[in-house]
């Protein structure tokens, strides 16, 4: 069967004109003999508006009720798109995450997909040409609606592609994957191919075009992943395992993460109980920790790490609670930092990348406060005001 998953982000379906244009494009592909599973996000800023509504009512909504509310954004979009498709002669069916058989586990607002039954789609395609599925959502074992967290619609699309063993195309308001953010550097080049590994690093380190777990899912099931601009003839980027298609440069891209917070904790004694309680609480609240560094000496314990700024409420609550049990605990949460990262699979085989990056920042009068590395990336915590300057200096230094 000539079957694919297509996903359209919130900016691509932000108004009815765009939804109608997408419907016409989908009709053309159906007429060419394809069967399509279409995943959509909420229209434009719908999710933000729902959150603003909640803020007007309460500062402490229960996660279960909040998840239930947030799923309505995507459900509106699938209904609208399916209505338009049927109106222009395409036999379409709208499906919630629950109707699509997306079973989830974990936190109501950060659930993970546990299982998808592909037989649901085989049956549905007997009577329909297009299945329009609400992204970002599923249902848990208690029959409660859950959401998948940041990038959840991308994850939905890739998971559906994996369960059906078909390609996945993700359409948004960018032309593909760039070596760095073209909004920061106009000359940034678009990459025709990127390996799964490099894309995962770019996503994790702030590139923003795709969420890490959706790329990881594609890698695990070897699903070809395409990223392109909605309704554009310009070529996008293929994300795949064939790294031999890539240029063998040490550095493929530069990523700037502006959605981070830097946390520093000090305690006059090296106390393992403090660390145990801290990391247990972080795990329970599904707060991902990055760039961890720890110093233990005669003066006590100092721990630094970074988190996503979307976890601001959780980290504040966790640290306030710890302070009641460890009265000498001192902590600072700094939102005026950003993370600049170099990414490239060629780093495995080439030396001198770290020293060159170090000297570039020093010569550009850009101080950094923390460094971390992986096999194919190097990251620095720097002042927010130096973020865009660092992107430009490193991009040119490595002739990306």
Predicted regions and their residues:
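Nucleotide/pyrophosphate-binding catalytic subdomain
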Residues: 1-215, 382-383
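Terminal amphipathic helices with adjacent charged low-complexity linkers/tails
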Residues: 41-47, 227-244, 300
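Conserved beta-strand termini and adjacent loop/short-helix elements that scaffold enzyme active sites
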Residues: 95-97, 228-230, 292
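Short hydrophobic alpha-helical runs that function as membrane-insertion/retention elements
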Residues: 167-172, 225-227, 290, 370
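Surface-exposed amphipathic alpha-helical tracts and adjacent flexible/coil segments at the periphery
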Residues: 210, 221, 232-238, 312
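Acidic-aromatic/histidine active-site loop/patch
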Residues: 218
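A conserved regulatory-domain signal marking ACT and ACT-like small-molecule sensing domains
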Residues: 238-400
